[in-house]
Each structure stands twice: as structure tokens, then as C-alpha cells.
Amino acid sequence: MFRSTFFGLSRAIVQPATPLTVRAAFQSRFYSAAAAASQPTTTATTTTPLQQQQQQQPTTQPTTPIQTQTGAAPTESTKPVAKPYLVGRAWTQRLPVYHLAKRGGNKKLTQIKKVQGDGQALRRDLAQFLGLEVKEVRVKVPTGHLEVDGHRREEIVKFLDGLGF
């Protein structure tokens, strides 16, 4: 016996010691004890047509696996190349590349956050991709940020996506 609550009401539920068959449960509910004792109870189980069909079918598995092609196999050019740096993603699964405006809006910057590893290598690769001088890309080592002169978010995101970040 255990207690059950349903919408704040408490009630005791008695579970039978042995599981009852459907017929025995029906008899105990709708017939008196004397009438139930006079009728023989059977424990034969009934099967549905679906269960009979499943029992008749053989249970062998095919010997050859089915091979499906879901797309082109990755080639050497599409595999991401291992780099000495990593740019993590924000909690929204977007790349952490942001536009900044300083000095009253006169100085436009693009900031890359969550840079891990060799920031100088990322600085060189990014400057080469953007066609900038290396001095126009700055590494902020304590914070793990890179700053690029100008608003270049779309180009930087394209570069980072191309690397597989």
C-alpha cells in the first residue's frame, strides 16, 4: 500500500500481491466473491492479430548493410586545417566579432573576442587576408581580444568561417 496525491487529495492505493489476469480483475470488480469462485478462471493470454503476424514473420536480419550516400565526402580542401589559435563562439553560437566606435565615433574598430592560443599567428593571417599591414591589427593579450582598424565584421566572419571556427 502506498499513498498517492492527486490535486492535493491524499488517498491510499492498495496493490494486489500477485498480478491479476484481465478476467480475474473483471470478476473481482463486477461479480460477487461467490459467483467468481463458482466460475473457473483461466490464465490463457489472448493475442491480437498484429502480435500473431509478428510471431509468424522470420526474425532474421539482412546480411548486407544498406549503404546510403548523404553528401559529398570531405576532400582535402574542405577539411579544416589545424591552426595554433582558436576563436570560441558566444553562447548564442555566433562568432564573437563586434564593431566599436571610439573618440566620439571618429575611430572605427572591429573587435574579435575569445581568442585562444597564438594570437600573433592569427594577427598575421588576418592581416594577410584583409590586405592590411600587421600594425593595423592589435593583440590584447590579457583579455584575449584582437582589434582591427575599421568596421570589417563581415570580412572577418567570412575569414573565420573559412577556417572552420
Swiss-Prot record:
Entries under InterPro entries matching the protein: Ribosomal_mL49
Domain of life: Eukaryota
Record keywords, A-Z: Mitochondrion, Ribonucleoprotein, Ribosomal protein
Biological-process GO terms, alphabetical: translation
GO molecular function: structural constituent of ribosome
Gene Ontology CC: mitochondrial large ribosomal subunit
Protein localization: Mitochondrion
Positions with biased composition (Low complexity): 42-75
Region listing for Disordered, in residue ranges: 42-81
Entry function: Component of the mitochondrial ribosome (mitoribosome), a dedicated translation machinery responsible for the synthesis of mitochondrial genome-encoded proteins, including at least some of the essential transmembrane subunits of the mitochondrial respiratory chain. The mitoribosomes are attached to the mitochondrial inner membrane and translation products are cotranslationally integrated into the membrane.
Assembly behavior: Component of the mitochondrial large ribosomal subunit (mt-LSU). Mature N.crassa 74S mitochondrial ribosomes consist of a small (37S) and a large (54S) subunit. The 37S small subunit contains a 16S ribosomal RNA (16S mt-rRNA) and 32 different proteins. The 54S large subunit contains a 23S rRNA (23S mt-rRNA) and 42 different proteins.
Family the entry assigns: Belongs to the mitochondrion-specific ribosomal protein mL49 family.
Name of protein: Large ribosomal subunit protein mL49
Source organism: Neurospora crassa (strain ATCC 24698 / 74-OR23-1A / CBS 708.71 / DSM 1257 / FGSC 987)
